Design a protein with these regions (language model features):
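Gly/Pro-rich hinge or "lid" segments in bacterial periplasmic/extracellular proteins
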Residues: 70-74, 159-210, 214, 224, ...
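Ligand-site clamp/hinge motif
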Residues: 202-248, 379-380, 386
């Protein structure tokens, strides 16, 4: 089984990555109460219903939803203070927090919450992945969702940044460049999809003091370049550094290292057409990947081996799951043999049951250096099983 690794294009690598952030030890940044953060990327547009761009709108302090996850992965209130659901799981009622204003000073009313969610449901083709809405009602401070199908995790669904609450009572015709007006600690001042994006303090923020007057989000795609920018003082915070770059700062009292087990998983998707249309080959590939070694040695503990779509940081019984395709190179070879894969030409690699060479292409994007490391390790592992 021969493998080719092609740089740049599609999908990815592991699971449960550790988010690494570096900041100077002093809380005083250059130019008064401002801060510059080096980020991997931002967004092509600030329209929150486009692709997954609502993630960056929320991640950098602008967007908020009715619920959210805390640092321990627990579901907690945000713009809703509490919620209840019917026994059949088809009716969910959320109490909207009083006294919240959008960053333009407009009151966040239950009616505007409903309008914001209805806008998202109308404009995003991702909504059916979360729930199937029949209707939404408003009664005082309560907003009630009537579902066509039961959903036991409606509160969790609404924590997704896709469902951030924005002011729909204003002119949003230029939202792609100006961004949505939301309730988070910051509001957009300027946006450059390939350069700097600036957010400024929301004077109407409802949940405590906002630490900076403004924050500049500077796109520095390469992790090593981002590390160098932090050392030179070009940026004040470096987000998502490689483990080897983090070691450059370890023990240096001038910097703080903050790390948090991520709620995100990084996947490698298999195309179930062509050669990988054969489930036996897919099973053999999975059993041939030594994810434990990849994460502990190659990524130096910066990730956790995955075995499910959700990471271990979410309490969905991850530790109790049985990985039927755990690393087992001998088992992988046996699966191939049982399915009729044989090394017909004696080159050390099997051909498929019809005698055709098996060539697989691993496609990944290059803004995260660890993906290339993983792809090359996967190539080496699959060579070992033929």
């Amino acid at each position: 089984m021969k493998n080719r690794i092609v740089n740049k294009v599609c999908a990815a690598a592991l699971a449960g990555l550790m988010a690494m952030t570096m900041i100077p030890a002093t809380s005083v940044f250059a130019d008064g109460n401002t801060m510059t953060i080096g980020v991997t990327s931002f967004a092509d547009t600030l329209e929150p219903t486009e692709q997954y761009f609502s993630w960056v709108i929320s991640r950098y302090g602008v967007g908020q939803g009715l619920t959210k996850f805390d640092e321990e992965g627990n579901m907690v209130p945000c713009l809703a203070t509490e919620w209840t659901n019917s026994d059949d799981g088809k009716t969910w009622t959320f109490t909207i927090r009083e006294g919240v204003k959008f960053s333009n000073g407009n009151d966040m009313t239950p009616e505007l919450v409903k309008a914001s969610l209805e806008r998202t449901m109308e404009m995003s083709n991702r909504v059916p992945e979360f729930f199937d809405i029949e209707s939404i009602d408003v009664d005082g401070q309560d907003i009630t969702f009537h579902l066509n199908r039961a959903n036991a995790n409606m509160a969790g669904c609404l924590a997704d940044p896709l469902f951030l609450i924005m002011d729909t009572s204003i002119d949003n015709s230029n939202i792609a460049m100006e961004g949505p007006v939301c309730t988070g600690p910051y509001a957009f001042q300027s946006f450059d999809p390939s350069g700097d994006t600036v957010v400024v303090r929301n004077e109407y923020y409802w949940d405590g003091e906002v630490p900076n007057d403004s924050v500049t989000l500077r796109i520095i795609g390469d992790q090593t370049t981002r590390s160098m920018a932090l050392q030179s003082g070009e940026i004040d915070v470096a987000y998502n550094l490689k483990t080897e770059n983090v070691f450059e700062f370890d023990g240096n009292d001038n910097y703080n290292i903050q790390s948090l087990e991520s709620l995100r998983s990084t996947y490698a998707f298999m195309n179930q057409n062509g050669a990988l249309g054969d489930i036996a080959l897919r099973q053999a590939v999975l059993r041939g990947l030594d994810k434990e070694t990849y994460t502990s040695i190659l990524l130096e503990g910066g990730a956790t081996p995955g075995k499910a779509p959700v990471p271990p940081t979410l309490d969905y019984g991850y530790d109790e799951l049985n990985d039927e395709n755990a690393y087992d190179p001998d088992g992988a070879k046996q699966v191939l043999e049982d399915a009729g894969y044989k090394d017909v030409d004696g080159d050390g690699y099997v051909e498929d049951p019809e005698g055709n060479p098996v060539e697989l292409t691993f496609v990944y994007y290059d803004s995260r250096a660890e993906l290339g490391v993983y792809a090359q390790a996967a190539q080496a592992s699959l060579k070992e099983i033929g």
